[in-house]
């Protein structure tokens, strides 16, 4: 029989353990997990939600085969100053969001924390505008507080 690279034998345990330890670092998922790269790259820093200030309103074209302009806002996060794009969910929801408003954003729910559906590069959605839920504003159950 041809020899394998792994040691075999009664006392090979430590050698196998050390070999496994060294080989692990060649797997990208292990490296990302051990070094915490997902949290470092995440604008929210691993948190489920984040507060920010609306910088501007933008309309993004939907990816093929759909044809639409998805209403989004650019938000500068308070915790670290990073600017992210967040989707405004609901019919005419963009009308309730003004520049310089404080909003709460959360993940949009795409696969592996990525973009969802036909909105290119948008990983977050607006949850609240000021103290009001965007969903309640769209439904007309709450009114936006005037300053």
Curated annotation (Swiss-Prot):
Pfam families registered for this protein in UniProt: Ribosom_S12_S23
Bilayer-spanning residue ranges: none
Gene Ontology terms: cellular component: small ribosomal subunit
Molecular functions per Gene Ontology: rRNA binding; structural constituent of ribosome
Alphabetically ordered keywords of this record: Ribonucleoprotein, Ribosomal protein, RNA-binding, rRNA-binding
Coiled-coil regions listed: none
Subunit structure comment from the entry: Part of the 30S ribosomal subunit.
Protein name: Small ribosomal subunit protein uS12
Organism of this sequence: Methanococcus vannielii (strain ATCC 35089 / DSM 1224 / JCM 13029 / OCM 148 / SB)
Gene that specifies this protein: rps12
């Amino acid at each position: 029989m041809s020899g394998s690279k792994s040691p075999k034998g009664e006392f090979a345990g430590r050698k196998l353990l050390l070999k496994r330890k060294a080989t692990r670092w060649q797997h990208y998922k292990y490296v990302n997990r051990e070094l915490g790269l997902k949290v470092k790259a995440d604008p929210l820093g691993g948190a489920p939600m984040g507060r920010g200030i609306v910088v501007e309103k933008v309309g993004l074209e939907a990816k093929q085969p759909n044809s639409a302009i998805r209403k989004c806002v650019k938000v500068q996060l308070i915790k670290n100053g990073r600017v992210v794009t967040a989707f405004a969910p609901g019919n005419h929801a963009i009308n309730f969001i003004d520049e310089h408003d404080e909003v709460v954003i959360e993940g949009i729910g795409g696969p592996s924390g990525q973009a969802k559906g036909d909105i290119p590069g948008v990983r977050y959605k607006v949850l609240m505008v000021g103290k009001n839920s965007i969903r309640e504003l769209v439904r007309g159950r709450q009114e936006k507080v005037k300053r």
